[in-house]
């Protein structure tokens, strides 16, 4: 009797969490069409810049863009200089103790903005015009972070976009060789 109640409560919890079993296979054709549309949108977004975009600094991709992580993390050494991905104007410099740490927001042409977070030092001020040659600051360990990296967010007209769709290729974090003997 106790086991029966456990099963019933489990089904209720699973149903409330939104899980509904299905026998359908994923719509492959629809997925391919959606992926192709995303590719075309990325090409259009990248073409809206007059100059090519650059990476803020050398490094490795340590965390990808997702619904829960609206940017990418580029792992690198502590103190690495951070450059804007393209020319723009500094619209915000701030410190968020729990989340982004020290961060800078740069407004670019055509409704784009880029945010650079977890900075150790910030070298720019709000209202300052910057080019990709200028230094925004240095990579640090401020805010909620587990190691030195830049959290880079890009928005277009207020909507988050995956930076990997318009930036040059960022190499994946190398796998650590296991010590086997």
Label each residue range with its predicted role.
Residues 78-81, 120, 126:
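Short, conserved secondary-structure segments in the cores of folded domains
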Residues 74, 102-106, 130-145:
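Short hydrophobic beta/alpha edge segments that flank linear recognition/processing sites
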Residues 2-11, 153-181:
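Acidic, glycine-rich catalytic/binding loops that coordinate metals and/or anionic ligands
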Residues 85-123:
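Zn2+-dependent peptidoglycan hydrolase active-site motif and core
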Residues 147-150:
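A beta-hairpin/wing motif
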Residues 66-67, 77-79, 87, 95-96, ...:
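Solvent-exposed coil/turn segments that connect beta secondary-structure elements
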Residues 122-130, 134, 158:
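Acidic, glycine-anchored pre-beta loop/turn
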Residues 2, 11-101, 132:
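Surface-exposed, glycine-biased beta-strand/turn segments
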